[in-house]
């Protein structure tokens, strides 16, 4: 099988549990370190699937790799190659396929609840016993509209579009606003490196969706384990459409 290409935008946003899950399933992958200067590949058909990770930047920033990534996503869509995106990655898919990505009125940082907005679609991607409330990890200040043909199936009280599917029949693209790839170590590292951002948001009176570092790290082993259980179901559904 061809490898899955994973696009990493920053040193502290690695593929985390996604890479662990792929290895457990015996699925080959390669990491494109955009933060280290790796070029964006030109041919989507060289890969079984594409995965885009998060990052502190915006898809609207004038960075050298943004438009090549968007072009690769469009090429993947045309070639029948499924794409999955985590946070910034979900925004990249939305932008590439024709939806606006804008600055949100507030940030979501930390553990936040999500609720199924399309129960039937949520069951398809998360299993028949999907609960009424899921806890997921968030760290974003932008939000996306839905691209043509997309269906959203998870929402939060602070940000409506949290997980969408573009079903192409034999494969599907999955865009997520949240981070289901987080491990306990990544959560702890992010809470430390982002402590100043958290403090600024809370001091400015924008604390509605922003948790303090101590709360982010509370029961992190159990929270991350449950998060990864949901991630495994999402990933298992997505890889059903891998090409070659």
Model segments located where?
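Short glycine-/acidic-enriched loop or helix-start segments at secondary-structure transitions
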Residues: 15-17, 41, 61-63, 94-96, ...
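N-terminal beta1-alpha1 cap of cysteine-dependent amidohydrolase-like domains
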Residues: 1-81, 115, 204-244
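Catalytic nucleophile loop
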Residues: 76-100
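Short, glycine/charged-enriched secondary-structure capping and boundary segments
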Residues: 19-21, 64-67, 98-101, 150-152, ...
């Amino acid at each position: 099988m061809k490898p899955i290409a994973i696009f990493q935008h920053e040193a502290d946003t690695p593929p985390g549990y996604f890479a662990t899950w792929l290895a457990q399933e015996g699925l080959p992958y390669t990491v494109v370190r955009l933060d280290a200067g790796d070029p964006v590949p030109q041919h989507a058909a060289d890969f079984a699937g594409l995965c885009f990770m998060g990052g502190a930047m915006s898809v609207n920033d004038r960075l050298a790799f943004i438009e090549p990534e968007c072009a690769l996503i469009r090429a993947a869509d045309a070639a029948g190659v499924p794409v999955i995106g985590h946070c910034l990655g979900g925004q990249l898919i939305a932008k590439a396929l024709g939806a606006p990505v804008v600055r949100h009125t507030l940030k979501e940082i930390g553990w936040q609840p999500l609720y199924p907005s399309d129960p039937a679609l949520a069951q398809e991607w998360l299993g028949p016993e999907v609960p009424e409330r899921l806890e997921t990890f968030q760290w974003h200040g932008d939000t996306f509209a839905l691209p043509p043909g997309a269906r959203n199936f998870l929402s939060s009280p602070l940000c409506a579009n949290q997980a969408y599917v573009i079903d192409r029949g034999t494969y599907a693209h999955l865009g997520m606003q949240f981070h289901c790839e987080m491990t306990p170590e990544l959560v702890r590292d992010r809470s430390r490196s982002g402590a100043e951002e958290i403090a600024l948001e809370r001091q400015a009176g924008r604390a509605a969706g922003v948790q303090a570092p101590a709360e982010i790290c509370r029961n992190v082993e159990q929270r991350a384990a449950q998060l990864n259980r949901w991630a495994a179901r999402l990933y298992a559904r997505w890889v059903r459409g891998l090409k070659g």
